[in-house]
Amino acid sequence: MTLRPLHDKVILKREEVETRSAGGIVLTGSAATKSTRGKVIAVSTGRLLENGSVQALAVKAGDVVIFNEGYGVKSEKIDGEEVLILSENDILAIVE
């Protein structure tokens, strides 16, 4: 299945990071915190401005980003994999 985001939405896959405790134990499940880093897999055509024009988004497919996981972030399972759908405003930085 292919998703095509609308408005100013971005679809990304969370990048899992291995988390270790201070003693070197690998934390999993509820003991580990979820990563707020992800790889963009699809972006919309842009944000609709008040004057009717469309402003392209700053991120593109393939970018690795750091995002704010808050109220507006939607988690969905597509073809057995979790994807996140969020507004470009929820993206804090592009990792270069």
Curated annotation (Swiss-Prot):
GO cellular component: cytoplasm
Taxonomic source organism: Actinobacillus pleuropneumoniae serotype 3 (strain JL03)
GO biological process: chaperone cofactor-dependent protein refolding
Family: Belongs to the GroES chaperonin family.
Primary role: Together with the chaperonin GroEL, plays an essential role in assisting protein folding. The GroEL-GroES system forms a nano-cage that allows encapsulation of the non-native substrate proteins and provides a physical environment optimized to promote and accelerate protein folding. GroES binds to the apical surface of the GroEL ring, thereby capping the opening of the GroEL channel.
NCBIfam families per record: PRK00364.1-1
Database matches in InterPro entries: Chaperonin_GroES, Chaperonin_GroES_sf, Chaprnonin_Cpn10_CS, GroES-like_sf
GO molecular function, one term: protein-folding chaperone binding
UniProtKB keywords: Chaperone, Cytoplasm
HAMAP family xref list: CH10
Pfam families (UniProt xref): Cpn10 (PF00166)
Top-level taxon in the UniProt lineage: Bacteria
Gene3D superfamilies registered for this protein in UniProt: GroES chaperonin
Subcellular localization, as worded in the UniProt entry: Cytoplasm
Name of protein: Co-chaperonin GroES
